[in-house]
Structures are given as structure tokens and as C-alpha cells.
Amino acid sequence: YVISAYGAKQNASAAQNQKAINKLIALVSKKGGGTIVIPKGTWRTGAIEMKSFVELNLEEGAVLQFAFEPKLYPLVRTAWEGLACWNYSPCIYAYKVSDIAITGKGTIDGGGNNDTWWQWNGNPYFGYKEGVTKEHQKMGSRARLQKMAEDGVPFDERKFGMGQGLRPQLVNFVRSERILIKDVKMINSPFWVMHPLLCKDITVDGVTVWNEGPNGDGCDPEACENVLIQNCIFHTGDDCIAIKSGRNNDGRLWNKPSKNIIIRNCRMEDGHGGVVIGSEISGGCENVYAENCEMDSPHLERILRIKTNNCRGGLIQNIHMRKVTVGQCKEAVLKINLDYEPREACYRGFEPTVRNVSMEDVTCQKSNYGVLIIGGNKVENVYDIHVKNCKFDGVIKQPTKVTGKTRNVKFDNLIINGSLVLNKEDRPYQTYSEWLTHSEMQRVPQSYLLDFSKKPKWSYVMGIEMEGMLDTYLHYKGGKSTFKGADAEANNEAIINYLKEYPAKMIDEKGNITGYKYEDFNLDNVRTAKFILRMHNLFPSKSSELALKTLFKQLQNQPRTKEGVYWHKAIYANQVWLDGIFMGLPFYCNYAVQNLKPKKAKKILDDAVDQIVKTDLRTYDEKTQLWKHAWDETHSQFWANKEDGKSQHTWARALGWYVMAMTECLDAMPEDLSLIHISEPTRLQLI
């Protein structure tokens, strides 16, 4: 049955062709079924309604183009974002039919663009113009429909359509069965592209979807069962495939989980998610299998995503993905979030459950997260999540992030950025501080060879790192270690033995320090003195005492600017660096408080605060509100501004060190300031 033989014409109006095509569909169905052919050429039409036993076949080169004439889309029973209502007829619609098909190499064009349907979403990006666009979602239709559903307003009283701004789907089959959509290309949908609702036995095969419009989901089976989606290409403005089962009250009343769904051999490009469960998922979802797919786009946000909240409720279980190759995605390879749309106006307390989710043999070259799970705060309802034999490279922010209440989240041979991700219970240490400390000790068995050294080295790097190790030891000693081995305390004692090795190797009995030259007046070489001082307080020795006196003497005699601030080094004459403040002053303050009489200690602390304040005045840049890393009082260095002497550069490292210098100097000051006769205003000035 070729439509041109039954009244349809390429030069006819959309209304005329709509009438001819719908009349032919009814005739063929009444005769027991058959194939209706859309021949090569462009055929404008309004909404058409499929009937049982009818195949709509688009020949190669045929374009079935739906006109932007809202009056050609009469009210029908449908659902909009998971809520039952009467709304504009989808472009191709069916209700309570069976054995229908859309096939062929032709194109179905929904006519969506910024001058037609898309502007109705109320976003200027899609053509909406305040005061010009007459029909749009900003008129409150979406919120009104949501409230009707929340309040239990009967379905037949929820009438929208003309003047309400709720855009129609491209293809929407309702309460139908045995459906085939094969080989066609679908473009420019007003809203969701393919939306089977409360249907079963559906095959979508070889379909190409190109739709960059708002809410342009590719294929959204809702409350459907026995669905096969294969060999398809999705380039969408929203989720490529989003499995749904009704929103809130309506989904619970339908009580029809989407289930038994296979997705295979598909390619996903742009879109919010590759394979998505939710968020209109109140009826639940089970038995989803996605495999052998390719996904790649800087705009594709997630690969497998489950999104829901405690307005929805529902049980989501048995969701499996395997053998998927990903070039890049924008956010996460696997994301489960139970706080989707946290400000949604709805009745809450319907806690959803997500369980038995697996991802296996999935690779990804770039993403912000590998696995991102956001559980609920009240109920432990995300559990039995298994990621196995996956390899994610180029992960920028965090390999795995799991928050909220979860249980049995397992990583089995998950490699992220070249490193094996361990389950929390499988980690040798439950805290990163202990784990990192022992990892470093294993990597560099001799503490004096840290910083990739080939021979014993005196360096600020060693001092900074070993102070962190010392803090770890002090925090976890006395049976507090999280080591899972047989002897946790002995394992912790290994830290302090490692730290003892450094002063023993680097300082001889006369207090001479290997690699240190007093005459260099190098502040970098003083930083490690703070570590030595802390170790000396725990394990006093004559050699350390002598070395500390030498290092303090250096600071007493350190060359200074005319304003009294330390030069960074003798070879960096007249230069003040933020680095140097951190390298020298914390030891300067700590040593003074611990070893000098109160009046002398006060003088040292006042001097330290004065240097910090003057450094602030000389390095702060009003334009950027950051501190330049250095200042040259002669204004002659190649890096110095000739007018004010400030460096051209701001170093993130130096900013951090400058703040830590102030913090550590404050820590050195006793709580009872009267003990060293320091005034509170001096301390407040530093704060």
C-alpha cells in the first residue's frame, strides 16, 4: 500500500497527508494487516496513529516530516515525564494495539528546532523569547501536572495539549505489544524520541537517532517488558537510553517494573547518559543487560547511570553491563545517585533500593570519576554493586567516590590510572595516612634516600615528608593502628624506626650535617630542622642538640633586607620568597619557645610575626588578590617588576607554604602567652 496511491501528495498540506495516511492505516488494519509504504521524497504530515497488524515502511530517500502545527496533534492518552495525562498526540502514536512495525531506510523528522517545538522548553538557548514565545513550559504546566499526580487527581481530569507547552514525543506506543522499529533514522524530535509505555515484546534494531534538542532522549521504554535494543546509533540532547517505570504516585499505581531488557551492539555519542535507569522509576526496574557497545564523546556525561530519589521508591535490581568500550565521558563511568532532583516538590519517604548492579570488562580513556555512588543518608539501600575486570584511564578528579549508606560495593581487578583499586575491607590499612606512609617506606627502604636520591641527602623534602610520617606514628601508636596484619603495633613501630634512621645517618657525633653548608645561608636547608627538633624531643641526643644549635645560629645570622626580612639564600641576595618564610620561621619559633628564656623567646616570636607581615605587604597583589612568590628589594632581578619588585609569578605551592608557615608559627606560641610575655595583639596580628 503506497501512500501516493491513496491520496497523499508531496505538495499537499500536512493536514491533507495526515488524513490520507491515517485513513490508509485504518483500512489496512481492518483488512487484516499489511505494509504501508512511504516512497522516496518528503511527505509533510501531522500526527498519525498506528493500528494493529500494520507495518509503516519508509523507502530509502523517504522523509516523513511532521509539521509544526499544534492543531494537527489532537489530545490522546499518554504520559509526560512519567505522569499519566491527556496531551498532544505524539508524531507517531498507538494505543492498545499489537503487531505493529516501523521499518525501512528512510527518515522520520519530528520538525524540532529553535523556531518550532524546542523553544517551548523555556530556555533561550533553544530559541525561547520572553514575551514572544506564546506557548512554553514556563507557563507552569509541568508543575501543575506534577501536583495533580501528587494529589491523586484522576487521569481523565489531567488534560493539557493546546496552549500548555508540553511537547509531544516522536514515537509513543501505549499499552501495546509485539512492536518492531527497524533501520529508520529519527531526527529532530520535539521531545523524547522513542517512548514505548506499558508495552511488551519490543524490538528496536538498527535505528539511528540524531536529536540535539532539549529532553531529547533516544529510547525510553517505560514500564515495559521484553525489550531488545540493538545495532543502534544514538546522538542525543539527553539520555541515549533511559529506562523508566512511572513517576511517584503514578508509577506506584501502575506497579509495572521495566524488566527483561537487552541492549547490545549500540553506539552512543552525545547525551547525558549512555544507559540510564530513571529517574521516573517508581515502578522499579529489573533484569537489564547491556553489552558490546561503544560510547565516546566529550559531551556524553555517564556510561551507566541509575538516578532516583525518595519521592520515587521502587526496587532497581539485576542491572548488568559488560564489554563496553568508552573513549571519554564527562563525569563518571558508573554513577548511582539517590539524591536526583533534591528540590523536587513531592511527598517523600519512599526510599528506593538499588541492588545487584554489575559492570564487567568496560574500558574508558577519560572521565572525571571512575565510580561515583551517592547513597542515601538514612537507609542502607544501595548494595551488592560489583565492578570487575575494568580499566579506566585518564580519571581526573577521583578514581572512586562512595558516599551515603552503602553495603558490599566490590571492586575486583578494577584498574584506574594504572593502579589497582582495592575494596575498603581489603586494604592493608583503613586510613590513607598509614597506607601512604608504609607505601613510601616500602618504595624507599632507607629514609635518607627519599626524594629519588642516589646518596644520603639533606633536603627540605625529607623534613616535610617525614614530619607527616611522624604525625601518623604519633596518632596511631598505642594500639590505634588500622593495619590488618597480625601485629599492628610492631607495624606502627616500623615507622619510628624508619624516622630514627635519618638523623642517625645524616648527623655525626659532633653535630655536623651531611650536605649542609652554614655559609650558604640557605633557608631551604633549615626546614628539616623542625623534623629533627621534634625527633630530638622524643629521643634526645647530643648530636641532634649540636646540629639544632647550628641551624638556629644560621637563622640568627641570616642576611636580611633593609626591612629585616630574611634573604632566601646568600646567592639570592635581597630576595624574599614565600617559600623561605615556610622553610625558616616555624623552626625559628619552635626552637625559641622550647630552648630560650621567655624574654628572648618573645623577641624571636615578635621578629617572626614582623617578617610575615612585611612579606605580606611586599608580595600581595591587589589585582589578583593573591601573593606573588617573591620580592626583590633592588627591583633588578629579571623576574622582578621594575616598579615594585614583585615577581611576575604566583606559585600555588608557595601560597600553601605561606599559609602553613603562619599556622605553624601560631602553633608554636603557648596557649598561656604570659609564659613568654608575648602580647595577644601580636598573635592576633598574625591570625
Q: Which residue ranges define each predicted feature?
A:
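Aromatic-acidic/polar surface patches that form glycan- and anion
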Residues: 17, 429, 458-462, 521, ...
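Short, intrinsically disordered, charge-balanced linker/junction segments flanking boundaries
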Residues: 177, 423, 670-679
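Surface-exposed beta-loop-beta
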Residues: 231, 246-257, 626-651, 666-673
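Low-complexity, Ser/Thr/Pro/Gly-enriched N-terminal "stalk/linker" regions
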Residues: 425-511, 542-558, 562-563, 622
